[in-house]
Regions:
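Domain-level signal for soluble alpha/beta catalytic cores
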Residues: 1-793
Length: 793
């Protein structure tokens, strides 16, 4: 597929609407009630040039099917059969089509990760049993949900698995995922092809296809919409010929699997086939670099990247106590302190007597990913603990570490391979600590060779050349540095060292550690594991990055040291850290506003209780809670914070509100409420993720939200408004077919004697459409808050 084009079909929903699909009707049930219609549509696409048709199974999940009389297996098997019937006499193949579950996964939502995996697995099992030729996971906006679906597909079938996600005009998904994070995560998890579908037309998505082709070795899929929809009539603005012309550039960028999504039909696929079938996809200009990520934070390992060492119980009594007590908030504070000090990766070690590492490591990983947005390096040799943690990690992590023993290689490398993790290879084996650089290099070569046999690319192998204590083995410092030099410069690998080991047992450890770090970076150390809370250590890294050409125009160096105020702040912070390093490392959040902004629920609740000793409840809302939420909202608008941060802050604010409510109740006072709002997803539309996010954010600004749910008739909205004397209504629609329902709801509300203000939003709603209806346009949850402030105060 890298060398020839493969043609997919176009939209199924568009064709079903053309054939009279009724508002609110579940399209997947047509596989049972009208399979000939589906077969006819599939056949039209095949006649237009389609080689792979997507079965009508996009929403055939347990959550949706529970409202019907049919099982997932009933619907999937019927849909696959209808598609296969269309392929008779042709070489076309049938893909099991899997869409999102319609509910946010934890921690942004309430759906547990393993429940999502199980729901997807049920679909996969049904598709395999029905004879699907491949699996296409599509229209994902949450990388975590895409991972759940991909794991289910890989664990329950041997079929090829393709995954496409939907990116908006910001170049990110709805949840903030970047192109590189998507590519490296899904590639590592074993996807056979990846790409983009839906959301925009080929012209708008072209820069994203170009970016994707630069960061993946996999075949790339393009299934864009027919331009952008007109919210008035639902028609898309790009005719077939123009769609096809734009797709020529998409193929030229390196895309090799092409089709269409919303608004496209067989005419589009025919025009596309005519325009590009003789083309050879452009070559991928791929940079094969080392890479770790979270969904919203891609981190290329180019130059020195600091790994924070403090999440480790060794020699840390308070940390040991926290592990034994399950005090994860303390561990989060340690993490935040390191990230604030400049750590770009966090090493995570929870191994301690009395601690169930298999249970604790994934708990800590989930908690850390809620609080900090840097990649994690999972520090354990327990294969079961690593598997449990890697399974719930969102993004591409690293495993620390695998040594040269054959047993360790055979046990740990398969786990890293399954979950797409990078591997730290420790240069020792069953013979013990090697004394020479040459011996360490030989072990490194064996580790790389073993990793490649398991399918782990060499750029995902980082070598730890061993830092030994110079006070006991002085000659070994030079051997370590020589090994680092060879591994990095001759083998071209990233190198790791636990730098502080060098100074154990010596006075003025900081000076020795700093000096060794500088020497090691000069020899090729790229991933130092250090304490970022030590100012002098981070100062050395900042200076080295300038001298090594990593800090362009000395920008980061100047920002760090460029003003007397900054220097004074650094001195004050350093004094605090050095006076009590263990305690201060965990005292990262002492400000209520900061706790809300960071989404730290426990800290926010604790600090709110403390603040009530000197402030009243209303003051907490007006001086702390609202300004903190406004700050996150502004960052969200600017594109420096994303949905996880927005929802995390809302959840922390919710914890503060609970404290305020309890305090008022104890005094016999009334709850703090700023006005009541009715929200609903309109009749015929079953999508409510966006509406639920709006509800959460509004509630945490102090508004009382009456959520009528999804698929809500206009009369129900009107009745609630009249009964509750509502002054503001929020309506959501995701599909163009449900816009008439939105219009009718607005019309009925406007006929009331004292009509409420109305705000509307959703993927298909535009500012012009909202203005035409005489409503406010709420592009997102943040905008809904601003509208509520205008209307209700």
């Amino acid at each position: 597929m890298e060398h020839k084009l493969t043609f997919l079909d176009g939209a199924m929903g568009t064709m079903l609407q053309r054939h009279g699909l009724k508002l609110g009707e579940i399209p997947e049930l047509l596989a049972i009630t009208n399979p000939d219609l589906l077969t006819n549509i599939h056949r039209q696409y095949i006649e237009a040039g389609t080689e792979i048709v997507y079965a009508n199974t996009f929403g055939a999940n347990r959550r949706k099917m529970q409202k019907t009389h049919y099982t997932v297996a009933d619907v999937v098997s019927a849909a696959i059969a209808a598609a296969k019937k269309a392929c008779i006499g042709t070489s076309a193949r049938v893909a099991l089509d899997i869409g999102p579950l319609g509910e946010l996964l934890e921690p942004m939502g309430t759906l547990p990760f393993e429940t999502a995996v199980d729901m997807f697995a049920e679909i996969v099992d049904a598709g395999v049993n029905a004879g699907a030729d491949l699996i296409c996971i599509e229209t994902m906006t949450d990388l975590y949900e895409a991972k759940a679906a991909l794991l289910a597909a890989k664990e329950h079938s041997t079929l090829p698995v393709w995954v496409t996600m939907s990116f908006d005009a910001t170049g990110r998904t709805f949840t903030g995922c970047t192109i590189p994070s998507m590519a490296r995560t899904l590639e590592g998890l074993g996807a056979d092809a990846i790409g983009l579908n839906c959301s925009q037309g080929p012209k708008q998505l072209l820069p994203l296809f170009q970016e994707l082709c630069r960061v993946t070795t996999l075949p790339v899929i393009a299934k864009p919409n027919a331009g952008l929809p007109d919210p008035v009539d639902g028609h898309y603005d790009l005719p077939p010929e123009e769609f096809a012309r734009t797709m020529v550039d998409v193929v030229g960028a390196g895309v090799s699997i092409v089709g269409g999504c919303c608004g496209t039909n067989p005419d589009y696929i025919r025009a596309l086939h005519d325009a590009v079938h003789t083309m050879t996809p452009g070559a991928h200009d791929i940079h094969h670099g080392s890479f770790l990520c979270t969904p919203t934070m891609p981190l290329e390992i180019s130059g020195v990247r600091v790994i924070g060492e403090r999440i480790n119980p060794t020699g840390k009594k308070r940390f040991q106590q926290a592990l034994l007590a399950g005090d994860l908030d303390y561990i989060v504070d340690v993490a935040i302190a390191q990230v604030d000090a400049g750590a770009q990766i966090l090493d995570v070690n929870v191994g301690y007597p009395g601690v169930d590492e298999v249970a604790m490591l994934p708990r800590v990983v989930r908690k850390l990913q809620e609080a900090v947005d840097v990649p994690l390096q999972l520090d354990s040799t327990n294969a079961a603990a690593l598997e449990a943690a890697l399974r719930v990690y969102n993004g591409k992590a690293a495993v620390n570490s695998v040594n040269g023993e054959e047993k360790a290689l055979q046990t740990l490398l398969p786990v890293a391979k399954k979950y797409g993790a990078a591997v730290v290879g420790l240069a020792l084996d069953e013979k013990g600590l090697p004394k020479t650089a040459a011996e360490r290099v030989e072990i490194a070569k064996r580790i790389v060779a073993a990793a490649e046999r398991f399918g782990i690319p060499r750029e995902d192998v980082f070598i730890d050349c061993l830092t030994l204590t110079v006070s006991a083995q002085q000659d070994q410092a030079e051997e370590t540095l020589a090994a680092v030099r060879t591994v990095h410069r001759d083998m071209g690998l990233q190198t790791v060292l636990g730098v502080s080991n060098i100074s154990f047992g010596l006075p003025n450890r900081l000076l020795m550690t700093q000096t060794f770090l500088i020497r090691a970076m000069n020899e090729g150390l790229t991933l130092p594991i250090i304490n970022p809370n030590q100012k002098e250590i981070m100062d050395a890294v900042a200076a080295f990055r300038v001298l090594n050409g990593e800090d362009e125009a000395c920008a980061a160096y100047v920002e760090r040291f460029g003003s007397e105020a900054a220097l004074a702040a650094e001195k004050q912070r350093a004094a605090a850290v050095s006076s009590a390093p263990t305690a201060k490392a965990a005292a990262a959040v002492t400000n209520l506003d900061d706790a809300i902004i960071r989404g730290l629920k426990a800290d926010a609740a604790r600090l709110a209780k403390e603040a009530l000793a000197t402030e009243n409840e209303l003051s907490l809302v007006e001086k702390h809670l609202i300004p903190a939420l406004d700050k996150v909202g502004t960052d969200y608008e600017r594109g420096v914070a994303f949905l996880p941060q927005l929802l995390g802050a809302a959840q922390a604010a919710q914890a503060v509100f609970s404290v305020i409510r309890d305090s008022l109740a104890a005094k016999g006072g009334e709850p703090v409420k700023k006005g009541r709002i009715v929200i609903a997803t309109v009749k015929g539309d079953i999508h409510d993720i966006g509406k639920n996010i709006v509800r959460t954010v509004l509630e945490n600004y102090g508004y009382d939200v009456l959520d009528l749910g999804r698929d809500v008739p206009p009369e129900t909205v009107v009745d609630a408004v009249v009964k509750e004397n509502i002054r503001l209504v929020g309506l959501s629609a995701l599909m163009t077919t449900t816009l008439p329902s939105m219009e009718e709801t607005v019309r009925q509300l406007h006929t009331l004697p004292n009509p409420p203000s109305i705000m509307v939003g959703g993927a298909v709603v535009t500012p012009e459409y909202a203005q035409k209806m005489g409503t406010f346009y709420a592009k997102d949850a943040r905008a809904s808050v601003e509208i509520a402030k205008k209307v209700l105060g």
